[in-house]
């Protein structure tokens, strides 16, 4: 888990409210979402893999380019990246990320990132799809590896996704069908966005 900013506040309890000094606790360091689903919800793990006929470094560059997700958003949908403690933005560890719009609010913090191998995004409690009473995503992870048939002349990449969500128990089937439709073309979007230089 990536630590959120922490701090300590020194107070003098002898100070009176008239001085303008108020008691203030430290910024908390806790998991972004509860470890167990709330009552009436179950843990759902949706996974999907794609075989992409592009080099792994280029698939990684596409996956970790903010413009891949920012460009093309139609208002009022919006994707934001806010700087981490080191002043970095984009896909870097500790960067705050939000994808918001009608019927959705996915807000979280980027976790461990290993170049060309792994990317982690952990969602904050309160994130939801369609309704907070139905679908509450908690984590989105991607893994990359060379494709099983990858060669130096014809490179390919296996891209694997895992989305962890707390789902209303009665709506698990609906969620799985929605995810199958939503993610179906993700791999082909990636492939079309990267020029197939190995064919040229």
Locate the predicted segments by residue:
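Hydrophobic pocket/interface hotspot
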Residues: 59-69, 96, 110, 121-125, ...
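Hydrophobic-ligand binding "helix-grip"
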Residues: 12, 71, 100-156, 164-166
């Amino acid at each position: 888990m990536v630590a959120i900013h922490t701090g300590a506040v020194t107070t003098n309890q002898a100070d009176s409210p008239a001085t303008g000094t108020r008691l203030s606790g430290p910024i908390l360091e806790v998991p972004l979402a509860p470890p167990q689903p709330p009552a009436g919800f179950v843990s759902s793990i949706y996974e999907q893999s794609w075989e992409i006929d592009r080099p792994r470094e280029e698939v990684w560059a596409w996956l970790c380019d903010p413009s891949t997700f920012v460009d093309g958003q139609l208002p009022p949908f919006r994707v934001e990246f806010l700087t981490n403690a080191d002043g970095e933005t984009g896909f870097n560890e500790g960067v705050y990320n939000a994808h918001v719009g009608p019927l959705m609010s996915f807000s979280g913090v980027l976790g461990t990132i290993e170049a060309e191998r792994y990317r982690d995004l952990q969602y904050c409690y309160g994130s939801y799809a369609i309704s907070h009473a139905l679908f509450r995503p908690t984590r989105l992870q991607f893994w990359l590896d060379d494709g099983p048939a990858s060669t130096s002349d014809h490179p390919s990449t296996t891209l694997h996704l895992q989305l962890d969500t707390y789902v209303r128990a009665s709506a698990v089937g609906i969620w799985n069908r929605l995810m199958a439709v939503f993610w179906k073309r993700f791999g082909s979007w990636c492939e079309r966005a990267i020029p197939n230089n190995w064919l040229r």
